[in-house]
Swiss-Prot record:
It holds the Pfam family Enolase_N. It comes from Chlamydomonas reinhardtii. Pathway: Carbohydrate degradation; glycolysis; pyruvate from D-glyceraldehyde 3-phosphate: step 4/5. InterPro entries: Enolase, Enolase-like_C_sf, Enolase-like_N, Enolase_C, Enolase_CS, Enolase_N. Its EC number is 4.2.1.11. Keywords: Cytoplasm, Glycolysis, Lyase, Magnesium, Metal-binding. Belongs to the enolase family. This is Enolase. It is found in: Cytoplasm. Homodimer. CDD domains: enolase (cd03313). Its cofactor is Mg(2+). One of its GO terms (molecular function) is phosphopyruvate hydratase activity.
Length: 372
């Protein structure tokens, strides 16, 4: 952090002094030129991004418009859309101490008529889940993880999906609330090209190892058995062939995070290879607002979905809420409706919806296909 602050004060600030904050692309390009590396390795993506976001906020203030409106203008987007929240309500993978291999089990209230109704649905399912977990696994299992989700001692992915489905039914939202998953499969990809669903238990007998073909079958089963509509990082980040196969089958949205890292170069490659059909947008992976807009533009032109995302380690900053509305991403992933740094984003989205009044449009059933 001190190095990033030092780079901002000593190198970036003097170079940008006097530039117009409304001219986001010019300023972002200036910082990229100052850095001079492909991966922003000299000044650091976190230093460059902090300035890029601050400039974006200053540009909105100079124009006297809300941040989301300024972002929409920068992107040349005329549609302000409230996104479908993808609440991470059960944690597994490397984020949790249970036996669950897959990292996130999420709910998406696509059947809501407004963002505020989607929030209510999400909260009700979340609390129904808490009741089920308490009854089945005990009070201890109700502790929450980094992103506000529960991490009960679930033994299998099927058990996790079943629990989420049960909570949706208990809350009375069958058909209106769907399920999403972040498999984060690179975490349990083995040297012999297999996927070890028992990777947390080492050493193990290898009975839970699966081939890419078996993983493909497993995802098909999940989508048939449960209302799963979105799967993120289903295969290892460089294992593009089975990922493309799953995308072609068109049984759900296939989201690229590790495979794309919000990099326009990798996005272009994935579009050509038809490897996935949705972009996970993490601004700190690419490092500037301009490049983030470019990645979203490419994704939308390819007919992809876009999910704006937080990070596991978050702050109270709500910038990504405005970003999701301004870029009409249609989806946002920023944790469970729990923990203040997660709710900060949801509260900002509620404020934006209120501010837009009768002009507020919720993505709802169109969550995957919103053009500019």
């Amino acid at each position: 952090v001190t190095k990033a602050v030092e780079n901002i004060n000593a190198i970036i600030a003097p170079a940008l002094k006097g530039m117009d904050p409304v001219k986001q692309a010019e300023i972002d390009q200036k910082m990229k030129d100052l850095d001079g590396t492909d991966n922003k390795g000299k000044l650091g993506a976190n230093a460059i991004l902090a300035v890029s976001m601050a400039v974006c906020k200053a540009g909105a203030a100079e124009k006297g418009v809300p941040l989301y409106k300024h972002i929409a203008d920068l992107a040349g987007n005329s549609k302000l859309i409230l996104p479908v929240p993808s609440f991470n309500i059960i944690n597994g993978g490397s984020h949790a101490g249970n036996a669950l291999a897959m990292q996130e089990f999420m709910i998406l209230p696509v059947g809501a008529s407004s963002f505020s109704e989607a929030m209510r649905m999400g909260c009700e399912v979340y609390h129904a889940l808490k009741g089920l977990i308490k009854a089945k696994y005990g009070q201890d299992a109700c502790n929450v993880g980094d992103e506000g989700g529960f991490a009960p001692n679930i033994g299998s992915n099927d058990e996790g999906l079943n629990l989420v489905n049960e909570a949706i039914e208990k809350a009375g939202y069958t058909g209106k609330v769907k399920i999403g998953m972040d498999v984060a499969s690179s975490e349990f990809y083995t040297e012999d090209g297999m996927y070890d669903l028992d990777f947390k238990n080492q050493p193990n007998d290898g009975s839970q190892k699966k081939t890419k073909e078996q993983m493909l079958e497993l995802y098909n089963e999940f989508c048939k058995k449960y209302p799963v509509i979105s799967i993120e990082d289903p295969f290892e980040q460089d294992d593009w062939e089975p990922c493309a196969k799953l995308t072609t089958e068109n049984i759900c949205q296939v989201v690229g995070d590790d495979i794309l890292v919000t990099n326009p170069v990798r996005v272009k490659k994935a579009i050509d290879a038809k490897a996935v059909n949705a972009l996970l947008l993490k601004v700190n992976q690419i490092g500037t607002i301009t490049e983030s807009i470019e990645a979203v533009r490419m994704a939308k032109e390819a007919g992809w979905g876009v999910m704006t995302s937080h990070r596991s380690g978050e702050t109270e900053d709500s910038f990504i809420a405005d970003l999701a509305v301004g870029l009409a991403s249609g989806q946002i992933k920023t944790g469970a409706p729990c923990r203040s740094e997660r709710n900060a984003k949801y509260n900002q989205l509620l404020r934006i919806e209120e501010e837009l009044g009768e002009n507020a449009v919720y993505a709802g059933e169109s969550w995957r296909h919103i053009g500019w």
